[in-house]
Amino acid sequence: MKQNKVKKMMQEGKPVVNGWLQIPSSFSAEVMSHQGWDSLTIDMQHGVIDYPNALQMLQSISTTDVTPLARVNWNEPGQIMKILDAGCYGVILSLIHI
């Protein structure tokens, strides 16, 4: 398992530059992962990216040192665990009501 670049940079107090992926394309994920981003977020909430698309995108990102993140549709443990198992190093949750 590769190092979580985002976690390390945050522990060191360094800024993290994150890219955003909303097109369901492993090719676009691969291109973006070679553009100097520290992390890339796969947006599964407001785009048309589903789990099979996200899995292919994660495979493309995994060939680089970019930290893969995902914003999931909702705060549902099964969905969160599934995307983490697929290779995400972090998850962005929205619509959290405490």
Language-model features: locations:
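Alpha-helix-loop-beta-strand connector modules within alpha/beta enzyme cores
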Residues: 51-72, 76-77, 81
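N-terminal amphipathic alpha-helix/helix-capping segment at the start of soluble metabolic enzymes
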Residues: 1-18
